[in-house]
Amino acid sequence: MIRPLVIALSLALAMPIAQAADWTLVNVVETPGSTADALPLRKGDTGSANLNRFGFYSDLTFDPKTGDWFALADRGPGGGLIDYATRVERIHVPYHTATGVIGQPVIKKTILFKAEDGVLFNGLNPLLLNADKSLLGASFDPEGLAIGNGGHLFVADEYGPSIYEFTSSGQFIRALSVPQNLKPVQAGGTANYVDGRPTIVNGRQDNRGFEGLTFNRSGDKLYAVLQDPLVNEGSSNEGRRSRNVRVVEFDAASGQSSAQFVYQLESRSVLNAIDPSTTDDFSATQQGRSIGLSAITALSDTEFLVLERDNRGLGVDVTAVPLHKRVYRISIVGASNVQGVSLAGSNSLPMGVVPVQKADEVDLLAALKAQGHEVPEKIEGLAIGPQLADGRTLVLLGTDNDFSVTQSGAGEQFDVCVNRADGTRAQVALNAPCPAGKALIPGVLMSFAVDFSAVN
């Protein structure tokens, strides 16, 4: 084992990751949480949270061939407990070609995801939709989006986790082959797509499946990131304690997985030390649960931008003060292929395993606070857009506002209305008006002008 380890480390050290690009936050655009999408309504329908409310940016991608952006909604309002036809929004984002200042997005088309038999994919969890926790069926929680060379939509799902290919109009084509070690199973090997630990003993954590998806620049490979470590990996075989998240490589043509790499989250001890005076530190079991990945987008065939964040900030629940919203640049050059390698039993990597190289790219929290913006909890979309007149590149980041909907322990849904000035909140019946002075949580787009030429 010594010689392979030396070789791997030598490769990693011989090919240092490039320095960060120069990121400038240009402006921030908020879209009201009550905004409707472009779904055609039947006669008599007036619209509702789970029918046509804009679900914003669980992921975001840019199509250079058309100049349009695609905004992915997730499983809908209510955390998988109410009916919702899953979808992607084709949008136009006006921008100034010299400065990168963006305006309000305009939805051009709402695209529903349809199965082979014409049935719409649905955000309901498998138990509610299929009456069977072991049957995924048309249950779908879209979280990652990439556009293929032919304009097809590739979507990463959190329930499975799954990756599906659709036509540009949303018609299902195929499912890629997801490695068995990622699939949630009970003791004995029965699939269970609904429950979490301790019922699930192997595979992805509940609500922590695939969270981001990208093609490499050549377009022949796909890379998906899980949000957090697998449920069984880490000390005490508990993923919540681990920093080690899997990046999964797929061959686009065959749909087969070809490799898995380890991405290491920032240590909770580092994040807790940001403000030593606070008492709301991340606990040991929040390391691999409250800190996670939200997006990945390719810079080349081997380098990627990855969005890492905590679960704090403006959202449907009151949280502690946010500490961590960053974009990192990673390289898979020299990283070990851990497909078939267990990371269970320890938070440390096995001897000889080299993680992806990781370097700080931009501190989103600092950039937002420097301009007086409130920090959203769920910054989840990250997309590289067109080149600006001065050679810089327009990069957009977007938020998931959970449709500004929460639910009670009994499974009843409510709209969340917030007064941003004083922080007061109210919960009202779905689709009911917010009290005076309060509004639904908005969707947020952040425009950055990025000088990638500054990278050495």
Regions from the language model: what does each represent?
Residues 20-456:
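Sequence/structural signature of beta-propeller domains
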Residues 1-19:
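Gram-negative bacterial Sec-dependent N-terminal signal peptides
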